[in-house]
């Protein structure tokens, strides 16, 4: 089984109402997508506006420098002028889209089926004459007569396209039909590979993507956080996790998805719901007492994969649903030993206040002190994580400073960022003294003018 990801956050994602990426943000997102390992990046429709054009131009520069490794795709209407604009940017592939359902042919294009086939063939051939790979997107393919859709795919193949994307433009497919559709296309149109572009109008985009893989699709179109027109398309983090679980294939670096999701959340201005799969705040937090007891004994009782797979950690809520196992574990993690009687008393206090949404560690310590009559001293954390923002001197090359920082003991990750600071450094230390030494080592690096340290209190 072969399957990869085309991420369209920079094209489909920016079609989310209210979302606009700056040129710098487009470049940063492209670098992050490449780092996470997506096979293709749909970088935008360059004929739409100058900022998209400039963004793709800068992305292609990074591609030539080897800083981006994903295949870069430029979007285009089936119009020669659009194709020329994409071709002059020297993208790796041009994706030409055209509505092929009867409703699109009549209401939008005002052409016959035969005329549409001629347009598709002519524009694909024209794009190929510029020396680029071509994908054809059968817009509204899911509502297209099957026999005609097969003709469309054969026309695209014969004109030079090596891929055809079947777009479920209004999100009406369901898994059984999706599997049958792709199985038929793969069988009837040899010599062509197929993508699925699944919209989520009925909440079935991920399920349809999995079914398409079973039917023979080799590329899944995604956006980070499921952004896109109306209710969006397949979320990258969700389909990547599902493909790993069901097919055993790691299509991207799963442990980098959280960071990528947070980056796109920040730049898009669209917040992730806390109960969002994989990257939402609650994705690996347990609440019910019986759930927590199970997880403490064996995490797989209530987790499909370990949170560490995705760069996350598990946690649980302390409130009226909490059982004694969870309470004992929480106090042990705080370094506080309570007797069974004392634990029962603390639990009774918690359950006597059922309207409290959750109890923080400091709240639990206060309750325990009131129950025991003792002053309780929690142990300091065994490991300290911190994020250190670094500002560089104006006359230095930021990347050179980044390289110097990356070799300092205790430094786990170094990222060049936009904003008031130039670099973000993730560090881990055994104790405050070691953390202070790491900070001093960072400040001593040539080109560093100032730092700001933030301690990591909790990871979701």
From Swiss-Prot:
Residues binding Mg(2+): 12, 197, 199
Pathway(s) this gene product operates in, as recorded in its UniProt entry: Amino-acid biosynthesis; L-lysine biosynthesis via AAA pathway; L-alpha-aminoadipate from 2-oxoglutarate: step 1/5
Residues engaged in binding 2-oxoglutarate: 11, 75, 135, 169
Catalytic center residues: 291 (proton acceptor)
Regulation of its function: Inhibited by lysine.
Names of the cofactor(s): Mg(2+); Mn(2+)
Presence of the UniProt keyword Secreted in the record: no
Domain named Pyruvate carboxyltransferase: residues: 3-258
Keyword flag Manganese: yes
Keyword entries, A-Z: Acyltransferase, Allosteric enzyme, Amino-acid biosynthesis, Lysine biosynthesis, Magnesium, Manganese, Metal-binding, Transferase
Catalytic reaction list: acetyl-CoA + 2-oxoglutarate + H2O = (2R)-homocitrate + CoA + H(+)
This enzyme's EC code(s): 2.3.3.14
GO molecular function, one term: homocitrate synthase activity
Domain comment in the entry: Contains an N-terminal catalytic domain fused with a RAM (Regulation of Amino acid Metabolism) domain at the C-terminus. The mutant enzyme lacking the RAM domain is insensitive to inhibition by lysine, indicating that the RAM domain is responsible for enzyme allosteric regulation. Moreover, the mutant enzyme lacking the RAM domain forms homodimer irrespective of the presence of lysine, which suggests that HCS undergoes changes in its oligomeric state by binding lysine at its RAM domain.
Similarity comment: family membership: Belongs to the alpha-IPM synthase/homocitrate synthase family. Homocitrate synthase LYS20/LYS21 subfamily.
Record's protein name: Homocitrate synthase
């Amino acid at each position: 089984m072969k399957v990869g990801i085309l991420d369209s956050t920079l094209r489909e994602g920016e079609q989310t109402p209210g979302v606009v990426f700056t040129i710098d943000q487009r470049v940063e997102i492209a670098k992050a997508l490449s780092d996470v390992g997506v096979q293709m990046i749909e970088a935008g429709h360059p004929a739409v506006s100058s900022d998209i054009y400039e963004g793709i131009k800068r992305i292609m520069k990074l591609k030539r420098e080897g800083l981006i490794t994903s295949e870069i795709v430029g979007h285009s209407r089936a119009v020669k002028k659009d194709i020329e604009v994409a071709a002059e940017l020297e993208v790796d592939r041009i994706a030409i889209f055209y509505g092929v359902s009867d409703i699109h042919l009549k209401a939008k294009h005002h052409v016959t089926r035969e005329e549409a086939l001629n347009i598709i063939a002519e524009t694909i051939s024209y794009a190929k004459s510029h020396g680029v790979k071509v994908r054809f997107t059968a817009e509204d393919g899911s509502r297209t007569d099957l026999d005609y859709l097969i003709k469309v795919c054969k026309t695209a193949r014969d004109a030079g396209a090596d891929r055809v994307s079947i777009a479920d433009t209004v999100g009406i497919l369901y898994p059984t039909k999706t599997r049958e559709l792709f199985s038929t296309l793969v069988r009837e149109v040899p010599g062509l590979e197929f993508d699925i572009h699944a919209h989520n109008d009925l909440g079935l985009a991920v399920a349809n993507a999995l079914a398409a893989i079973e039917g023979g699709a080799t590329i899944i179109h995604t956006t980070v956080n499921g952004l896109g027109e109306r209710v969006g398309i397949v979320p990258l983090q969700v389909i990547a996790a599902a493909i790993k679980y069901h097919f055993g294939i790691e299509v991207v670096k799963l442990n980098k998805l959280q960071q990528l999701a947070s980056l796109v959340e920040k730049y898009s201005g669209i917040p992730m719901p806390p109960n969002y799969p994989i990257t939402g705040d609650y994705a690996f937090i347990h609440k019910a007492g019986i759930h927590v007891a199970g997880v403490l004994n064996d995490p797989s009782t209530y987790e499909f994969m370990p949170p560490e797979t995705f760069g996350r950690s598990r946690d649980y809520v302390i409130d009226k649903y909490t059982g004694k196992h969870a309470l004992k574990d929480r106090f042990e993690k705080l370094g506080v030993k309570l007797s069974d009687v004392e634990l029962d008393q603390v639990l009774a206090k918690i359950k006597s206040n059922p309207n409290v949404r959750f109890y923080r560690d400091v709240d639990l310590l206060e309750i325990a002190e009131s129950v025991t009559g003792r002053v309780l001293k929690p142990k300091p954390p065994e490991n300290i994580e911190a994020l250190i923002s670094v500002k560089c001197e104006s006359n230095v090359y930021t990347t050179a400073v980044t390289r110097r920082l990356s070799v300092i003991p205790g430094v786990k990750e170094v990222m060049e960022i936009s904003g008031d600071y130039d670099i973000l450094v993730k560090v881990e230390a055994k104790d405050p003294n070691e953390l202070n030494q790491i900070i001093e080592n960072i400040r001593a690096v040539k080109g560093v003018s100032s730092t700001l340290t933030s301690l990591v209190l909790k990871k979701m």
